[in-house]
């Protein structure tokens, strides 16, 4: 079982360094299908696109992601439409990835497996 599912996101208000590339790759192995991307400011994100049968199933998934995100106190960027939802996660306070991002990714994946 993924040990990230047993963890809780810890509030981050800065003052810590974002993961370096070796830490990112170590944690990426724990979240299947999540890609490492960078935005134009060179900030790392985790991203994943989920596919669904229709708009309503996409919306239901996004609503469940919202519930998990609120519970964890860590909020992704979400876009969705007919048959898809795309999730992007980063720790804005440190301009990069932290363990919180991988915890949230694992918990989002669990929504799909239920």
Task: List the predicted regions and their residue ranges.
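Long, contiguous binding/interaction regions
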Residues: 1-56, 60-114
């Amino acid at each position: 079982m993924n040990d990230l599912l047993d963890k809780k996101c810890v509030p981050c208000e800065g003052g810590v360094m974002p993961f370096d590339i070796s830490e990112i790759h170590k944690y990426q192995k724990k979240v299947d299908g999540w890609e490492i991307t960078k935005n134009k400011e060179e900030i790392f994100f985790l991203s994943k696109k989920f596919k669904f049968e229709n708009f309503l199933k996409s919306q239901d998934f996004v609503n469940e992601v919202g519930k998990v995100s609120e519970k964890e106190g860590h909020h992704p960027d979400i876009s969705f439409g007919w048959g898809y939802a795309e999730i992007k996660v980063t720790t804005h306070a440190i301009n990069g990835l932290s363990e919180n991002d991988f915890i949230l990714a694992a918990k989002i994946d669990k929504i799909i497996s239920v």
